[in-house]
Amino acid sequence: MFYMIGCASSAANATCAISIRRRFATTAESASAAIKLIDEFKKNHGLSDFVYASDEMYLAAGQELPTFEECGDFEQIENGVGLFRRFEHDFMNALEDLPTAPRMREFDSVSGVSIAPHMSRLFKKLLPYNIKINVHPVVNDFFGNTVTVTGLVTAGDIIKQCKDCLNGEALLIPHTMLRENDVVFLDGMRTDELAAALQKLIWRVSADDGYDFIDDIINLIERNA
């Protein structure tokens, strides 16, 4: 597996970002060693906002994700650096405009194994608004169980692992799982085929923007009142 290390620098009012990829074994020990290397580089060179470890590196190491403030300007967000913290920050702000549903609405959601506990804790913030989202971590049998990111989860694995444990009225699918106009998974299965196999409404939701995610939930509730 590749872990992402994002590097960014600014000069003459222009900001550029480069990405450095290095192969690390998918163990907590190697991920921890990589994070330590990055921290030492920052300390030794006085470059606190120059190099960052991706969220996946911290998750693999079993370490707490950096805070929102520690993620800098999120210049490497496309490489997974600070992705969850920005989503969380925007999600919490968006809650201020979320109307309380007139009755309890329950949905299911799927994710990669590594981020599932964080998403589950975050979604509990929706309970006062009469919205319950059950998070189902999906082990990646298609690419190998050392692959734990959400964007590489396939429909076949969702069917095998979740078919008998979905209690909500719809299944939320993070948009990063989908390709080809947001309807095809990496294993070639379409969202309508997944819906037929699970006998569930499939609803695409944003996986990287907390504001958009809340809007997606509002639209789901309004269209299925």
PLM features per residue range, with description:
Residues 4-225:
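Auxiliary Fe-S-binding modules of radical SAM enzymes
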Residues 1:
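Active-site-proximal cofactor/substrate-binding loop regions of enzyme domains
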